[in-house]
Amino acid sequence: MLDMKRNRERMVKQQLETRGITDPAVLAAMRSVPRHLFVQEALRAQAYEDHPLPIGYGQTISQPFIVALMSQIIEPQPGLRVLEIGTGSGYQAAVLAEMGLDVYTVERIRELHAAARDLLRTLKYRKVRLKLDDGTLGWPEAAPYDRILVTAGGPEVPLPLIEQLADPGIMVIPVGASKRMQELVVVRKQGGRVVRESKGGVAFVDLVGTHGWRG
């Protein structure tokens, strides 16, 4: 366990601080959350390396830098309500909860949803609520959300997510006309206006659903 703690510290210093991650809350959360528990046991030795890892069912856990970058982009503050689309193994949700945000997370794959639910409960992340559903529809029953973070790439920003974003609010989402190659888009809603900004190229798994790619 001590080695894993050292690995987390090395990850923060070498992969995050050197690449523009400066938010103290994000850095503290990345130091704290045991990423190795959110990857397959056979891959735990690689948990803190600078690349994504498969988690089964054609899905991945994003590389640490991308998790930190997206967390920083949404300007996290304790008590904000955040909707995550694409629970995966639950790591991004844990990072958000570690920073004190109230997390609502949606996953379409039943097995991943169940595994993430059990692990987050074991680790006592009580501020995380999970739902099994089509993430492109959001979670309308609990809307609006101060922040929305999407961990899969679709052809466009789903309209339901724009509608469920609070005003003011921030969303970060990979968007691209071709699968697996997108731009990281920041959507800001302010005073009834919606403004988009690109943060550069990224490569995410497909956002599958009614307002995404067909499965």
Curated annotation (Swiss-Prot):
It is found in: Cytoplasm. It catalyses: [protein]-L-isoaspartate + S-adenosyl-L-methionine = [protein]-L-isoaspartate alpha-methyl ester + S-adenosyl-L-homocysteine. Its EC number is 2.1.1.77. The active site is at S62. Gene3D superfamilies: Vaccinia Virus protein VP39. PROSITE patterns: PCMT. GO terms for biological process: methylation; protein modification process; protein repair. It comes from the Bacteria. InterPro entries: PCMT (IPR000682), SAM-dependent_MTases_sf (IPR029063). Belongs to the methyltransferase superfamily. L-isoaspartyl/D-aspartyl protein methyltransferase family. Catalyzes the methyl esterification of L-isoaspartyl residues in peptides and proteins that result from spontaneous decomposition of normal L-aspartyl and L-asparaginyl residues. It plays a role in the repair and/or degradation of damaged proteins. This is Protein-L-isoaspartate O-methyltransferase. It comes from Nitratidesulfovibrio vulgaris (strain DSM 19637 / Miyazaki F) (Desulfovibrio vulgaris). The gene is pcm.
